[in-house]
Amino acid sequence: KYYKLVANGFIIVPSYYKTIIKDAETYMDLSLKDSPEKDILLMRKYAHILDKGLHRSDVEAGHSKNIYEMLKSLIERLSTTKYSNDATCIWAQSKLKKYEMLQEEPKSFKPFRGKEITSKISYEDLVSLIKLRRSNRAFKEQLVTEDIIIKLKEVVNWAASSCNKQPIQLFVTNDPIWAKECLMCCKGGTGFSDFVPTFWAFTANCRGYVWPSEMYLPFVDVSLGAQNIFLAAETFGLSGTILSWAQKNIQENLQLRKLLSIPDDCIIVFCAVIGYPLYRYQIPTRKDI
């Protein structure tokens, strides 16, 4: 830490930036440490970089050798961890093999191509679903089953993420008593019905973001994935309300992490309550773009 200050200099800022800077430094320090969690995030990143090149019509042998070597090294390290059979690890291995084919037989190489697929969902149906999504704070006394929670979690990683890192980790409880206790950690958790069906913490593993310039990417990545969940929730008759985590204090942060067993390397981006609405809130008018 002191080396970073000497090497990069320092500035004086208002005291209200203290918590923000402390959080950023904490996550930056964690991201610099080696771990399997960091390796798999970076593995997806480097596999994504190779994948982009392997889709190009003008792809040529000889490019991105450093990326290839880093990816190969990461896959080898992960082969002795719990991530060895992870679907994305197997996917990354296929990119590695395709890259090797390009180097060995460039003249006969055929770039990657996906299947031609036409969506069966019309623009009108999609817009209708988007407009149907509504934030609600009053819920029926009806439990949200584990099966539905699993189905909602399955859609989160189908959103885009920076360099395909897929950093999102979800921490959820469908115990109404427990959910209500979690809600008390959020300053925006007011005006809710007494029955709180589920509580969700949307987090990003910080270990895949190793540069200061990437500081805000976890918030972008999590938000993109979360939108998938809220749209999918509407298809089950569920509605969710997002709760900002920007105003949390030290005690609230510690308490929520304890309640949901959220590790230190997961950045809590925001939280949410999801359940069956007791009644629908009116739709606010939207401005034109």
State where each predicted segment sits.
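Acidic, surface-exposed loops and disordered segments
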Residues: K1-I289
